[in-house]
From Swiss-Prot:
Gene: lepA
Domain tr-type G intervals: 5-187
Xref: NCBIfam families: lepA, small_GTP
Record: residues binding GTP: 17-22, 134-137
Entry protein name: Elongation factor 4
Keywords linked to the UniProt accession: Cell membrane, GTP-binding, Hydrolase, Membrane, Nucleotide-binding, Protein biosynthesis
EC number: 3.6.5.n1
Length: 600
């Protein structure tokens, strides 16, 4: 009997907060995978940060055993995916490991930007999509309208979509039936050479790297010699098994169509990249599975220890996080203002925040982070070109022929009342309007091309505040475009503070420089001498503010008396302040580095 017939591999895709992880909990509970005692909320979100923010960061998997009423037993492999735009590549690999996807839509909110983005990813991977409408127990639920919307916008049949409530457990049985009925069984040949997709990997201090795999062809068991196709490295499999969400070893191994894990004493996650193909060393498959891309950082930021002596500890912390996160890259750098630290590359803003939070939390380090910047392509007048990740490394303007910046294609879904505000925001951020489609009378999708550097700072927050939190955003990198950019330097007391330098579009340099100078004036404490704050482009000062000096009243002891006596004392004080200003250093508080981002 072909056991593949009784396997279903599926994942759950949804917009943030539409109840994806809660639905996963209910499915685990319904199939008896976990007992009531082990049940806690969001079982598959294992990281403390994931639970706290209520988001899924790493993909997880679980094997459910579902008994139908006719006695047939099915193995359902649930692959949980992150829903955030930073982790799109991980989602696409998780989806490539499945044959079907459950599309969860919130009955009160309808389709959102991420729902569409992840749904299109699923369609790109030729998955069977099963719509499920969640949160029908709420008073404001509109299941019939939402069904219509799914049919109109995505074009998939939603007439008999199960109406469930993941919170109360209503109609969860229907979802399991739909999975078995609608999602096709996996294909694949057990006797062909081994071909398996790594859809996630993490580091375990006892087992080395644990690779989550979906076997497409062939089989793998302990003792098999395997080869990873992107690096051509060979390892011997130590253990194979399945997820119940905890790891459960299986001696007989995994065969075509199954989802499970392998360990092979791999030391670093970078050697077992997500999206790579595993094959047998002795009998390799002809071609790797399509779609592998090395993780490319999109956003760079400097991370420095508050206490310079903790530099080594910070390095260790980043190395440990990197073992588990192949997308994180870092290299040492020094800054005149902040001392020794690292320039780190991240997938996006959420990824950056998470790493910073984990460094502070898991390793108890106080860190200062500099403004995030994107990667610019710089072409010099002598024809050389290079990638610029740190604004301080920009050569003088006279040596630069032109610069290019990354541009993203953004889709924003918003209620029609806020269309004007959203378009105004996009225009203000140098966006190019592409098109606009109405989803229903009250909601619209707007497509814009926007430079990534405009999104990196606070685009998302501003978008939320302009639409009272109703708009949702999704974006993908489109490519690089030539643009007029300049480097904005900030000088304090005549000294350039390298950590505050940034690259800005020429047209916005004055406005941005003025705003930063005003902001710093509020933050920098008063010193015994006056501190000029200047914003400069090249050698030209474009804005200036002054933090006034604190002074002692030297005339307090003179009662009446001659004016020349007072003049002498004031002159003496002036001389002293002048000398102080030449020798004095300006203290820059930590908030100054972050406040630069919040300037609007």
């Amino acid at each position: 009997m072909d056991k593949k017939k009784y396997i279903r591999n599926f994942s759950i895709v949804a917009h943030i907060d539409h109840g994806k992880s809660t639905l996963a909990d209910r499915l685990l509970e319904k199939t008896g995978t976990l007992t009531q005692r082990e049940m806690e909320q969001q079982v598959l979100d294992t990281m403390e940060l994931e639970k706290e923010r209520g988001i899924t960061i790493k993909s997880q998997a679980a094997r459910l055993i579902y008994k139908r009423e006719n006695g047939e037993e099915y193995i359902l492999n649930l692959i949980d995916t992150p829903g955030h735009v930073d982790f799109t590549y991980e989602v696409s690999r998780s989806l490539a490991a499945c044959e079907g996807a459950i599309l969860v839509v919130d009955a009160t909110q309808g389709i959102q930007a991420q729902t569409l983005a992840n749904c299109y990813l699923a369609l790109d991977n030729d998955l069977e999509i099963v719509p499920v409408i969640n949160k029908v127990d709420l008073a404001s639920a509109r299941p019939d309208e939402i069904k219509q919307e799914i049919e109109d916008v995505i074009g998939i049949e939603a007439e008999d979509a199960p109406l469930v409530s993941a919170k109360t457990g209503l109609n969860i049985e229907d979802v399991l039936e739909e999975i078995v009925e609608k999602i096709p069984a996996p294909e694949g040949d057990e006797n062909a050479p081994l071909k398996a997709l790594i859809f996630d990997s993490y580091y375990d201090s006892y087992k080395g790297v644990v690779c989550h795999i979906r076997v497409k062809d062939g089989k793998v068991k302990p003792g098999t010699k395997i080869k990873l196709m992107s690096t051509d490295k060979v390892y011997e499999v130590v253990e194979t098994g399945v997820f119940t969400p905890a790891l459960m070893p299986l001696k007989e191994g995994l065969s075509a169509g199954e989802v499970g894990y392998i360990t092979a004493s791999i030391k670093n996650v970078r050697d077992a990249r997500v999206g790579d193909t595993v094959t047998e060393a002795a009998r390799p498959t002809e071609e790797a599975l399509p779609g592998y891309k090395p993780a490319i950082p999109m956003v760079y930021s400097g991370i420095y220890p508050v206490d310079g002596a903790k530099y080594e500890e910070l390095k260790e912390a980043l190395e440990k996080l990197q073992i588990n996160d192949a997308a994180l890259s870092f290299e040492p750098e020094t800054s005149v203002a902040l001392g020794f630290g690292f320039r780190c590359g991240f997938l996006g803003l959420l990824h950056m925040e998470i790493i910073q939070e984990r460094v502070e939390r898991e390793f108890n380090l106080d860190i200062i982070t500099t403004a995030p910047s994107v990667i610019y392509k710089v072409t010099k007048t002598n024809g050389e070109s290079f990638d610029l990740t740190n604004p301080t490394n920009l050569p003088p303007m006279t040596e630069i022929a032109y610069m290019e910046e990354p541009v993203v294609k953004a889709s924003i879904i918003t209620p029609t009342d806020y269309t004007g505000a959203v378009m105004e925001l996009c225009q203000d951020r140098r966006g190019k309007f592409i098109d606009m489609q109405y989803l229903e009378e009250t909601r619209v999708v707007i497509h814009y091309e926007i430079p990534l550097n405009e999104i990196v700072y606070d685009f998302f927050d501003t978008l939320k505040s302009k639409t009272r939190g109703y708009a949702s955003l999704d974006y993908e990198l489109k490519g690089y475009e030539q643009s007029k950019l300049v480097k904005l330097d900030i000088l304090l007391n005549g000294d350039n503070v390298d950590a505050l330098s940034m690259i800005v579009p020429e047209v916005k340099a004055y406005q941005r420089g003025r705003a930063i100078a005003e902001k710093l004036k509020e933050i920098i404490p008063r010193h015994m001498f006056e501190v000029p704050i200047q914003a400069a482009v090249g050698s030209k000062i474009i804005a200036r503010e002054t933090v006034k000096a604190m002074r002692k009243d030297v005339l307090a002891k003179c009662y009446g008396g001659d004016i020349s006596r007072k003049k002498k004392l004031l002159e003496k004080q002036k001389e002293g302040k002048k000398r102080m200003r030449q020798l004095g250093t300006v203290e820059v508080p930590q908030e100054a580095f972050m406040s630069v981002l919040k300037v609007d």
